Amino acid sequence: MIPGEYLCADGVIEINPGRERIALDVVNTGDRPVQVGSHVHFPQANAALDFDRAAAHGCRLDIPAGTAVRFEPGLAQRVSLVPLAGTREVYGIGPNPPGKLDDPEGEQ
């Protein structure tokens, strides 16, 4: 083995198996490209991205960990989102992070 080398299993590796998915159309209304990483709470992504933020609440991009999607200015593209897992708490991404996503009292 070489230091830093990846040894992957044979066959197809499924990302987020069995997870519910939603598809949303996103348009970059800004004048420069925007990249969104794999674990960003998608509704808190750059304000220049136009999409249904309410529908995306509690979700992240359905892409491999450590990767990102690039949105070019003026172009529309469809993305697949999956619900955030784990404790479903979001802090520090933007000025008004939602906190506990499943809090019955609403956002904190």
From Swiss-Prot:
CDD domains: Urease_beta
EC numbers: 3.5.1.5
Membrane-spanning parts: none
UniProt keyword Cytoplasm, yes or no: yes
A Gene Ontology term for the protein's cellular component: urease complex
Taxonomy, superkingdom: Bacteria
Subcellular localization: Cytoplasm
GO molecular function, one term: urease activity
The protein's enzyme class: hydrolase
UniProt keyword annotations, A-Z: Cytoplasm, Hydrolase
A GO BP entry: urea catabolic process
Main location: cytoplasm
Catalyzed reaction equations: urea + 2 H2O + H(+) = hydrogencarbonate + 2 NH4(+)
One of the Pfam families matching this protein, by short name: Urease_beta
Pathway given in the UniProt record: Nitrogen metabolism; urea degradation; CO(2) and NH(3) from urea (urease route): step 1/1
HAMAP family, per database record: Urease_beta
Family: Belongs to the urease beta subunit family.
Subunit structure as annotated in this protein's UniProt entry: Heterotrimer of UreA (gamma), UreB (beta) and UreC (alpha) subunits. Three heterotrimers associate to form the active enzyme.
Xref: PANTHER family: UREASE (PTHR33569:SF1)
Protein name per UniProt: Urease subunit beta
Species annotation: Nocardia farcinica (strain IFM 10152)
Lineage: Bacteria, Bacillati, Actinomycetota, Actinomycetes, Mycobacteriales
Gene: ureB
